[in-house]
Every structure is written in structure tokens, then in C-alpha cells.
């Protein structure tokens, strides 16, 4: 059972060529066959089948199908679903069950989506390889000795391997886009505030956004349209009107389109194969009528440093609530209240989370606040001003999604700084708050996926998806990805 896109699935469902229950069973069977890959932390087998049957009855009874009728979806395990485990891939949330639904989940459910389960991730969304999970790493569907990227590695692998049609992830500095690039799928981070964060476990609140991972731009656009919009439960959500992204997307032409290409994104640290694939695709667009405009973004060298100061500072505050007293893991070795806090956090958090909490606490401490945190905030403002200025002269900024192709499991775990550089091209859009996405455009000499990263102005998701749609390959909806299992 294969579907070229959700539109294909929907037409078959509405014509009664296939049932929601049969579709759900197909995906659940595939999930079961990949059980050893750690892609899902929790599978909603009974709930998904029950939901599918109720949707079949709705259609048979003449009910109006929702915009996502029968779409099989996966949810990253830092997004709340009432009555379901919420682990954030951490020992700290061992045994915790969410008591409410995220706004994004409610909106998807209202349009008749089917939730298959919760996907693996880097612990508390901190990582670029999905190796920082208490449940173990997730292999890349293209090569099971390599990482799928992170922190939404489980969601990316689920879509790429045909274990979900679309998945939700969260993106703080590239956690949707980078794994999308590594797994040969589309990964979209919307404008900050475009999707409500209510129900998303906070990592860095001024950066976090729920994003979409899909096989193609059309499916990503539809899911974004359903989730987008103001929410009274999230004061940072935007009241900016939600357009029909699918319609906006198809109106985008390459003729006269100005594509900004920053020279800083093609420096000597960029893998030669990645550079070659990206430049070839940009040249292809030029031959189809687009104009390539050379840009200079000198602040790019400061992106990683500023980002890790700001997000670790926010993380140290956000994660203070996980103390062993209210919920989650509590150490049995504690003798008193003070040791309960210390031992619960020491035993409950993984190494990378503890590293970031300590970094954040340090940059917020007396004597260092002005030197680090305040300076990083000033750099953030410079980024915002420079990117606004750059996008006055071009329609989109384009470059590689990652400086290198998917790397081997264990290759970078001993060097945190090298791991952090995996997000060097995705972090700027997060610092600025602009929408960005990764679209697959080719393969390196080893057959590993390469993605192009696009950044557009605030709330220009429709235009960005339209540009990406011109880039995606005709076979972009294939299921599943190649695998050496």
C-alpha cells in the first residue's frame, strides 16, 4: 500500500477504494517491522485503530471529512497529548502522563488526523543526532550506521521510512530542518508565533516552534495551515492572518525570483559534495528564470556562539521545574530535601542536558550576565536587522541545510563543539524568528541526502513553500526511503 501524497490518500479514502482502518493497520504494521530502530517511544496501536474505525463510520454516515481526514501522523515526544506518556526522551520524565493536549494536537485532531504514536528525540530537544535519548539512538533510514539528525530524529526517520505520512517536530535551532536534510524529506520551521507553543515542553521559549516533517511541500503546507493561528493559551502566538498556503504555494513563479546566496554559507568548512549539490540546484533554478544574488552576512560567524549562550540561559530557567518534587523522576538515594533536588537532577538528566543547564546558569550568573547573555542579546538584534535588510533586496535566502552529510553514530559525541556546528546554517533563522525550511535536492558521492535551506521574511511561509516546491524532485513523495535493514 503506497500513496504519492496525502491528496492521493484522501482521494482513495473518499472514493471508498481504501478505508482509514486499512491505512492505519498498514502504518502500524510497518512500525512493528522497525521496532528495533527506536523510532517510536510509544505506539498508539489500539487508539489509532479505534480512531480510524470512527472516521470510517463518519464517512459512511455522510459526515463531512476534515481537511486531514485519515492522515497517519507521528508526534514528537515533547508535545503533550492527554492521557499519553510524555517523556522528552528523558529518565527525568519516567512514568509521567500528560494531563492536557497541545493546541497543535487539538487542531489536527479536529480535522480528522490519526495519531500513530510519539517519536524518539534528543533528550529535552537538546542535540543534533538523536544520540542523546534515554531510549537509545535512532538509525538513519538511508544507512543504519549513521544518525538521522536531531533533535527531531525520530519524527524525520518515521516519515522517511514510511512509518508515518507526516510528523510533528519542534525546532529551536534547526531540530526540524537538520534531520529533514539528513533524511531526504521536507522540514518546515514556521515564523516564531505562527503555531501555538501551548503543550510543547519548553527548551528555549523565545526560540521554540512546532514544525512539520513531510515527504513533500504540499503535505507540509496543509498541516501548517491547520495548526497555524493565534491561541489564547500562548501569549507569543501571532494573530497574523492564516492564508491558504496551498494556493499561495502554487502561485510562486521562478521567473524574476531573486535568490540571495550568502558567501559565508559556502566557506572552506563546507563539505565539497554538499557544496556541489547545492550549487548545481541553484544553477538549475537560474536557468529556469531565477536570479542568483550574492549576499554578505558577516554576522554569521557569531551565530553558534550567540545561540548557545541564549538557549542555554533559557534552558537553565525552564528546566528548573524538573526537581524530583512535583513530577517525574525522584532519586531513592536522597536523605533530605536538598539532596533530593541534587540527586534527582543528577540521575534524571543526561550528560548533554546537564552540560547546557550548567552553561546557562554560568552565563546568567553575577559578573558574567553582561559579558555573555547581554552581549548575545545585542548580537541577536544585529542578526534581526541584517536579515530584514537582506530580504528587502531578495525573495529568499538559500544555502546548505548542514555543512556535512549524515555522520556515523558515535562520530561526534566526544566533541560537543563539533556537534553544535551541525546547526551552523539553521541557527540564524531561529535567532531572527523568520520561517525556514529544508528541502531535499540530491545526494552526495556516497548516496547520502543533501538538503537546501531556505529563509524567507516573517509570515512568508506560502512563498517559501512555493519556492521549495520548484526544487523538490518529482519522486519526492516516494515511500519508503532506501534502507539497508
Swiss-Prot record:
Organism taxonomic ancestry: Bacteria, Pseudomonadati, Chlorobiota, Chlorobiia, Chlorobiales
Keywords: ATP-binding, Ligase, Nucleotide-binding, Protein biosynthesis
Function description: Allows the formation of correctly charged Gln-tRNA(Gln) through the transamidation of misacylated Glu-tRNA(Gln) in organisms which lack glutaminyl-tRNA synthetase. The reaction takes place in the presence of glutamine and ATP through an activated gamma-phospho-Glu-tRNA(Gln).
Pfam families (alphabetical): Amidase (PF01425)
Keyword ATP-binding: yes
Assembly and interaction partners: Heterotrimer of A, B and C subunits.
NCBIfam families: gatA (TIGR00132)
Organism field: Chlorobium luteolum (strain DSM 273 / BCRC 81028 / 2530) (Pelodictyon luteolum)
UniProt-recorded name of the protein: Glutamyl-tRNA(Gln) amidotransferase subunit A
Catalytic activity: L-glutamyl-tRNA(Gln) + L-glutamine + ATP + H2O = L-glutaminyl-tRNA(Gln) + L-glutamate + ADP + phosphate + H(+)
Family: Belongs to the amidase family. GatA subfamily.
Coiled-coil annotated spans: none
Biological process (GO), any one: translation
Any GO CC annotation of this UniProt entry: glutamyl-tRNA(Gln) amidotransferase complex
